[in-house]
């Protein structure tokens, strides 16, 4: 037992002299191969969960956990990149099929990108009617009388609110300060009745 622990310690010491360990991680996702090179500090020694765990096996376990985490991260990145490519390719429509269903139209859009086929189903309102750029623009089946009544009531409400606001502003009074310079020194007084009385006394 002592002999094997001495070999383990010498292996750890030899690894520590190298100062760094370079590991290449390989992951495969959807037929694509991703590689990543990771350099770790070789002077780190994991002592294990108890006093009998060897440093070498613990270091190897730590490196394996790191490799698994990096592989998972690379695979996740790959999946995100594939999704992004799918969203980009959906703009290029290759074929579509329209099916009228009375008040709505269902369109199926099919796109192909990198050998993958993507489909999207879109449902649109079939009652929409665009009649041109002139003054007779209408939106069917809504009526114009309802919308004009709504606009009228909205305008009258706005006018009433504005009138109430302005009348309340007119009825409010504020105290302003004015400066009066007499013969001896400057006196500051309010512009109300008290200020007028004080100014009259000063002028006499």
Swiss-Prot record:
Residues 183-204 form a propeptide. It is found in: Secreted, Cell wall; Membrane. It is a lipid-anchor; GPI-anchor. Its main location: secreted. Residues 84-104, 133-175 are annotated as: Disordered. The GPI-anchor is attached to the protein in the endoplasmic reticulum and serves to target the protein to the cell surface. There, the glucosamine-inositol phospholipid moiety is cleaved off and the GPI-modified mannoprotein is covalently attached via its lipidless GPI glycan remnant to the 1,6-beta-glucan of the outer cell wall layer. One of its GO terms (biological process) is siderophore transport. A lipid is attached at residue 182 (GPI-anchor amidated glycine). Induction: By iron. It comes from the Eukaryota. GO terms for cellular component: cell periphery; extracellular region; fungal-type cell wall; fungal-type vacuole; side of membrane. Residues 135-175 have a biased composition (Low complexity). Keywords: Cell wall, Glycoprotein, GPI-anchor, Ion transport, Iron, Iron transport, Lipoprotein, Membrane, Secreted, Signal, Transport. The keyword ATP-binding does not apply. Residues 1-18 form the signal peptide. Involved in the uptake of non-siderophore and siderophore sources of iron. Has a role in the retention of iron in the cell wall and periplasmic space. This is Facilitator of iron transport 3. It comes from Saccharomyces cerevisiae (strain ATCC 204508 / S288c) (Baker's yeast). The lineage of its organism: Eukaryota, Fungi, Dikarya, Ascomycota, Saccharomycotina. The gene is FIT3.
């Amino acid at each position: 037992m002592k002999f094997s622990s001495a070999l383990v310690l010498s292996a750890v010491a030899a690894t520590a002299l190298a100062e760094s360990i370079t590991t290449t991680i390989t992951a495969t996702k959807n037929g694509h191969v991703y590689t990543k090179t990771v350099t770790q500090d070789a002077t780190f020694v994991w002592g294990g969960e108890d006093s009998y765990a060897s440093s070498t096996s613990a270091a190897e376990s730590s490196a394996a956990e790191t490799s698994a985490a990096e592989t998972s991260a690379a695979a996740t990145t790959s999946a995100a990149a594939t999704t992004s490519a799918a969203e980009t390719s959906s703009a290029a429509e290759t074929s579509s099929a329209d099916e009228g269903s009375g008040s709505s139209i269902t369109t199926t859009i099919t796109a192909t990108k990198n050998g993958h086929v993507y489909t999207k189903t879109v449902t649109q309102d079939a009652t929409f009617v665009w009649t041109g750029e002139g003054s007779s623009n209408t939106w069917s089946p809504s009526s114009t009388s309802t919308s004009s009544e709504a606009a009228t009531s909205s305008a009258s409400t706005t006018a009433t609110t504005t009138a109430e606001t302005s009348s309340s502003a007119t009825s409010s009074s504020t105290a302003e300060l004015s400066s009066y310079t007499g013969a001896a020194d400057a006196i500051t007084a309010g512009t109300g009745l008290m200020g007028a009385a004080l100014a009259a006394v000063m002028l006499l």
